[in-house]
Amino acid sequence: MSSYFVNSLFTKYKSGDTLRPNYYECGFAQDLGTRPTVVYGPGTGATFQHAPQIQEFYHHGASTLSAAPYQQSPCAVTCHGEPGNFYGYDALQRQTLFGAQDADLVQYSDCKLATGGIGDETDNTEQSPSPTQLFPWMRPQAAGRRRGRQTYSRYQTLELEKEFLFNPYLTRKRRIEVSHALGLTERQVKIWFQNRRMKWKKENNKDKFPSSKSEQEQIEKEKREKEQASGTQSAGEDCDKAKQM
C-alpha cells in the first residue's frame, strides 16, 4: 500500500530531480542576489542532515535526497555584503544594552549625553538644594492653634465708636473708606462692628439689634427715662432716710 503512494509520487519527477523544488526555481529567487542576508555560521548547512527514517521511507529516491543543494554548500543562497547590514541595521545594534561600558557609548553619542545629564542633575541636587520659599498660607495649621486677637488703638476705637453711633450697619463702600482711614482691613472693621452690636444687645437686654436709626434712638430714649426714674426714686429714698434721722 505504501509503495503505491510512493510510486505515484515519483512519477511526477524525473530521475535525478529532488523531491523538493530547487530554491532557485522560485519567482523571487532572482531578486535575492541584490538583497543582503544574515549568516548564522559557516557550518550550519553542512551539519544539517535529514532524519534517517525519511531516506528509508523513500527507498526508491535515496540517491536523489543526497543531492540536495543545501548539503553541498554552507549557504543555499549566495551571501552579498556584510551580514550586519541586513535591511539597513548596523552591527552596533547587536551589542548588549545592559552592562555597556563608556567606550561602547562613544558610538552612541545621544545615549552618552543623556546618561551624563542624569548624573549631573543628581549631583547638582545633592550639592546645592534649591531653597523653597514658604508663604503664610503654606505653613501647617496646628489643631489647637488660634489666631491672635486684634488690638485697636485708642484713636481707632474712638473713630469706630463714632461711626457706630452714627450708623451701626456699614455698607461695603463705607467699610472700605473706614478701613483705609484707620489703617485696618475690611475684615477687621466688619468683625469690630459685629462684636459691637452683640455688646449693645447684651447691655440693653434685647434679642435683636434695631434695624433703623429711629428705632435705636427710641430705645436710647427709653433707657434714659428709666435711668432718670431710678435716679429720682433713689433720691426720694435718701430724703426719707434723712428725715427719719
Swiss-Prot record:
Basic and acidic residues bias (residue ranges): 202-228
Listed GO MF terms: DNA-binding transcription factor activity, RNA polymerase II-specific; RNA polymerase II transcription regulatory region sequence-specific DNA binding
Keyword terms, alphabetized: Developmental protein, DNA-binding, Homeobox, Nucleus, Transcription, Transcription regulation
InterPro entries: Antp_homeobox_TF, HD, HD_metazoa, Homeobox_Antennapedia_CS, Homeobox_CS, Homeodomain-like_sf, HTH_motif
Main location: nucleus
Positions of region (Disordered): 202-245
Protein name, as recorded: Homeobox protein Hox-B8a
Organism, scientific name: Danio rerio
